A protein has these predicted regions:
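Long, C-terminal-biased catalytic regions of enzyme "large/alpha" subunits
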Residues: 1-173
């Protein structure tokens, strides 16, 4: 009981596409099913904790390498399936797929309910165009969303280039 046995998952978005034809970022029925799936996982780990007297938890896995490996294997075994194996990787955990265009607010609203179900670990990522170091309001907006939606952990990714030799900075790619 000195540690935690974590049960993680990747590819919820692709699983939902397979089951209902859309992922949770684009469809309320898919969101409802996604929450049911992860709630089931949480309930099971709670049962395991009680039964085996060990600490179990569900974690929203950030597994870029594994997500690619699973997709390659599934593509080999099942072929090219639109919306599922037609990309190079599965989406991390309960994230809205990066290719799906939606606002940061919509992404937060969709992903936030999973944070309470994945107490073993989770993260909310926001991609911001350009250099956010000169736009602190963009960062504060993300912090406000975390508070509003009761998110446990978040990160803001933004484009910033800096030469370590001369110190030149820009936000061009």
């Amino acid at each position: 009981n000195q540690g935690t046995l974590g049960i993680g998952f990747i590819g919820l978005a692709e699983a939902l596409v397979a089951l209902v034809g859309k992922h949770h970022g684009e469809d309320e029925q898919a969101q409802k099913l996604g929450l049911e799936i992860v709630t089931y996982m949480k309930d099971r780990v709670n049962e395991f904790s009680e039964k085996y007297q060990h600490n179990y938890s569900v974690l929203a896995t950030p597994a870029e390498g594994l997500a690619g490996r699973f997709t390659r294997r599934d593509k080999k075994d099942f072929g090219l399936i639109k919306g599922i194996t037609d990309r190079e990787y599965y989406t991390n955990s309960n994230h809205v797929p990066v290719y799906y265009q939606c606002s940061a607010h919509q992404k937060a609203k969709t992903e936030a309910p999973y944070h309470d179900l994945t107490r073993g670990g989770h993260i909310f990522y926001v991609e911001i165009d350009g250099d956010a170091t000169h736009n602190p309001d963009a960062i504060l907006t993300v912090v406000d969303m975390m508070d509003k939606y009761n998110m446990g952990y978040a990160s803001v990714n933004h484009n910033r280039n800096r030469c370590l030799k001369c110190g030149y900075e820009n936000s061009d790619t």
